[in-house]
Amino acid sequence: KLSHIDLLVVGLPVALFAVKKAALEKAMTGKHDVGDGKTVTVAKALAVAQPQGALVHYASVHQKMAEIGKEQSLIIDPGSRTFDWLVAQGMRLVQKQSHSINRGMSDVLRLIAHAITKDIGTPYRDYDAIDLALRTGKSPVIYQKAYDMSRHLALADSVAQQAVSTMREWIESPHSLQNIILV
């Protein structure tokens, strides 16, 4: 509905932030065709590391902007395809301690689907059913029967452990963190 945007804020995975920031901001600035003969003009674009917006949101919602501005924070964003973390001193990104890896929920879903495939002897790829089961604790129905996924939960845990172990290697002073925010 808007034809002009003064400032468009976009996010990048932490690992790509330094190398893609300028190119993304340039690509987002200017006139864009949005279909049906409509265009939107973006006056300025600002790329931020994906979890950085969560820090600003948290500080704003909890009315802690001034305090967090003086503290060190860790923001963890486990996504579908990437696991991002960001260390911030105040609101500023600490690039050398922030990163992302290609580990996400899609890896968990694929591993569990593969285990179910081996168990039932036929290809199983209902990732939505697996995702729902993980979120609710309710077994997915496979061949009209509730399927107990509990024996496959260690696979999900292994993906999470890999991601967290990698993150811990990057963080220099975990004892100095005042805030840990999970997106």
Q: Could you describe each region identified by the protein language model?
A:
Residues 53, 80-81:
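Short, glycine/acidic-enriched loop or turn micro-motifs at the edges of active sites
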Residues 1-73, 92-107, 119, 128-183:
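Nucleotide/phosphate-binding catalytic cleft detector across ATP-hydrolyzing
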Residues 77:
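Conserved catalytic-loop position in the HRD/HxD motif
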Residues 83-87:
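Short beta-strand scaffold segments in enzyme catalytic cores
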Residues 110-118:
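Long, charge-rich alpha-helical interaction segments
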